[in-house]
Amino acid sequence: MYCPKAYENEKKNEDLEFERSQSTFSVSELNFILNNNDHNIINIKNEIKKFIDNDEIISKPQEIHFLSREEQYKRALYVSSKLIEIKKRFGEIGRDQYYQSLFEEIPFVINDIVFACAFKSLASDEQMNRLYSKFENYQYFGSYSQTEIGHGSNVQGIETTCTFIKETGEFELNSPNLTSTKFWIGGLGKLATHTIVFAQLLIPSSIDGKLKNYGPHPFILQVRSLDDHSPLPGVTVGDIGPKLGFNSIDNGFLRLDHVRIPRENMLSRFFRVNEQGEYEKPKHPKLIYAGMVGVRSSMIENSFVSLSRAVTIAIRYSTIRKQFKSNRLDKQEKKIIEYSNQMNRIIPYLAQTFAYFFTGKRFSIEFDQMMKAVKHNQDTTLLSELHANSSGLKSLMTQSTSDGIESCRLSCGGHGYSQFSGLPYLWSNYVHMSSAEGESNLLPQQTTKYLLTILRKVLSGGGGSSDTTTADDDNKPIGKSVKYINDEFQSSFENINQFIQEKGLNSIIHPDSLLQLFKHRSFILIKSIAESIQEQMSNGNKDIPQIWSDLNVEINHCSKAHCQLYVIQSFYDQILLLSSNSSSCSSSITTVLIQLLQTYSIWIINSNLVDFLQDQYVELSQIDFLKKSLINFYKLLRPNLVPLVDSFDLCNTTLGSALGSYNGDVYSTLYKWASTQPFNKNSLPLGFNETIKPLINSKL
């Protein structure tokens, strides 16, 4: 655990120290688990935190709030430049830990995460060998140009074109109209030298010469000179302007005027155009979007990072802040964390933070397994399931993380509105994730479409399961994350009581019982949509797109239910794995993790009661019991709240918060930052003598 000498010399808040003394588990042991049981990662993290705390500029995150857009970007470039030293010392692990330890986002993250995920997924081995080291060593800077000013989530509808010129063996990229302008492209506004452009692939027919559209494909394009960084001929590029947040990142626009690139610039791991202009298609149509799935995998994994910061600030502040006495005899006011409505604002999101950590870990492993199978054997068995889950999980986890940060901000009352709390900046920098790489209100449709495919397969008798998933081949077994659809179809249990009795469980709040409730709920929602579609068609409505559109709300909710099940299953599986190895995880930790799992599950049930009651699988009395149990779990977790957020081991510079510092010096820090801000340097504001003073001296 990281504890710099500066923290040791600070006065410790007695309330926080008392909270830490109440812990029922080892904080350092849980921290070890959160770092993949790897001492090397912890040591690297500690060195990076020390590096950050010792830097005169990076260690003062509160100063960001007083900078202009240009000054913010200049600061971000300075912080980015320090990454070179980190990478030299610690390699790629150090790079990732540096990003996670910073208060602000920096431009290099686009090259290292977004571009790198896409390039490594889509580039051939030859292209990787020829180009990737240039981006890795920051000789080139990459970006990912898919979204257009007129098209976002509808990737098939993008308007940028890439025409194969057979006479020269080149491609020609073009922006045919205003709405084809690439827009919102991270890192492109000022920094990127190259970008991956998604464009409609047009190839002349060998028979009549007419252009045939093969759909969106990725191409690597140099946009700026390596000598003076100016835009290359035919390239119009710039920054899109101020945003709600994320302003240290240069989101850009791009227009192309018949720009020629070599045929070899088509990213061709899965598809290519040969010298004769013949298109060699991918084994699976969704392989074109492998890069996008890679970026989503990173977003899914990193939702934990932002949410852990928010709950750390909210919980520490809530144990220090005191308001109202329980009765006149009390000497002190009550900690606001003691109030049940405050617990309800924060504790579910603390539980969600841990759930999302283990979910991100699982999905990252599954993505790596899928890409390995595709690259080595052209095996697309895992792709459909992974693509569907990435769509729904990205939607669920980014939106609920945004909601969690906002709930934590609100839990801090008026001080949560101050930028000095660290929460408004955290939220405004994160909230764009709901729209990035697929709008979160549209992506769930891809998930539900896949779930309906699995249901149709099960109903037709093809429900044999394995640890793999079906792609477009009906002979392949269904996958692990959707196996419950077949299980529920085959199940003889009419209600949860029969399941509890059969499994020999002691209560509906047992994790196995809760997991079963989520499996049944998801199955019922999938089946309900299938029945609604069938009913419409039986009544003569053959307009499938319109039926689908009319059911969009239910479709999105169905995806959410499936993904919440995925999260709970991931969390529970990891707890079982940890508990099976007593040498690496003590029973005290598995106990508190199970309490977090139960809290998260019951909280979701309470928020979606109609789903769980609709077919009488659960009794009303059991729902009432679950509602009361939630408050009991809050009380069980109460002594461990501060220790749980301490296990994230977030340093003060990372949080950038007067409310959430490790030693709890809230009020003096808040006053110090307020009183020393630049706006208070002069007693008279600019313009006072010209505008206000004449009014004071006038005789109106």
UniProtKB/Swiss-Prot annotation:
It is an enzyme of class 1 (oxidoreductase). Pfam families: ACOX (PF01756), ACOX_C_alpha1 (PF22924), Acyl-CoA_ox_N (PF14749). It is found in: Peroxisome. SUPFAM superfamilies: Acyl-CoA dehydrogenase C-terminal domain-like, Acyl-CoA dehydrogenase NM domain-like. Its cofactor is FAD. One of its GO terms (molecular function) is fatty acid binding. GO terms for biological process: fatty acid beta-oxidation using acyl-CoA oxidase; fatty acid catabolic process; fatty acid oxidation; generation of precursor metabolites and energy; hydrogen peroxide biosynthetic process; lipid metabolic process; prostaglandin metabolic process; very long-chain fatty acid beta-oxidation. GO terms for cellular component: peroxisome. Its EC number is 1.3.3.6. A motif (Microbody targeting signal) lies at residues 698-700. Its main location: other. Keywords: FAD, Fatty acid metabolism, Flavoprotein, Lipid metabolism, Oxidoreductase, Peroxisome. The active site is at E437 (proton acceptor). Catalyzes the desaturation of acyl-CoAs to 2-trans-enoyl-CoAs. First enzyme of the fatty acid beta-oxidation pathway. Belongs to the acyl-CoA oxidase family. This is Peroxisomal acyl-coenzyme A oxidase 1.
